[in-house]
């Protein structure tokens, strides 16, 4: 166990000025970060089910990449019992456990040096539709992770969650208007101003804007639940053939955009359709295990935003969520076809979905750089 309660040094320049860029997820990784789930008003049975699931995810990642887990001091003893021994536990306060959204975006340069972008965070909407209050500890998470690695820090003047962007490492950024242009994130910024900031801090050139994310996604439609890059020039889209499903118009509109766009290198995109699970719904038993608090209530019968696109690419391994016995094997087969050179590892992940996200949402990769 190590302690990370120290600030990382803020820089006054921007990554693009310094020759740094966000690499694609398939670039070599030195570590993956996770955070211990503990909110009783978001995770049933005070997080016990989620903690066991996070341990399985950490184990699946650990076969390919070292795992760090931020844990509040009060939960360290419990985490040591539950987590695999290969996981490095780091004492760290947090309001919840979404490392993708509260952790840093690590950028690299041609020499293999790593630095981190620390985005603004307001719990997916602040006082206008946000998911809990307060979020002050979450705002410190990125700094603590960067300090653990000794990386210098850029402080970006933009409210942004890591789950709202995907990049191909070759100049293209994919995102969703439903989230990034939402009035509860950066109401004073225009689309053009947001693009300019992403150019500055991700060092990208071209944007692919999908309108909406997955139906009932409480993050306001994060791209990482809806569509991702598989490799340069290839994307994977969350899909249903059922035209009566509320998801269909969202996926169809996204497909239309993807079919009529090019990436930063001028390539037309190859599009893989990954069938959705379910539809999946929260059960009464699952909803009763969540206590009342400042978090969003978990209601029986509520549709869950389940998606197989919410997987992690880490050092030639795909760690993806198992969500529905009728479609899990189809998803695994499809992923193996898309990634023939990768090991495909499924982890039962309904407990993460019940809390509002999935495997990509609870992980944040640290690129190797060198």
UniProtKB/Swiss-Prot annotation:
It comes from the Bacteria. This is Putative agmatine deiminase. It is an enzyme of class 3 (hydrolase). NCBIfam families: agmatine_aguA, PRK13551.1. The keyword Hydrolase applies. It catalyses: agmatine + H2O = N-carbamoylputrescine + NH4(+). Pfam families: PAD_porph. The keyword Nucleus does not apply. One of its GO terms (molecular function) is protein-arginine deiminase activity. The gene is aguA. One of its GO terms (biological process) is putrescine biosynthetic process. Its EC number is 3.5.3.12. Keywords: Hydrolase. Transmembrane segments: none annotated. Belongs to the agmatine deiminase family. The active site is at residue 361. InterPro entries: Agmatine_deiminase, Peptidyl-Arg-deiminase_porph.
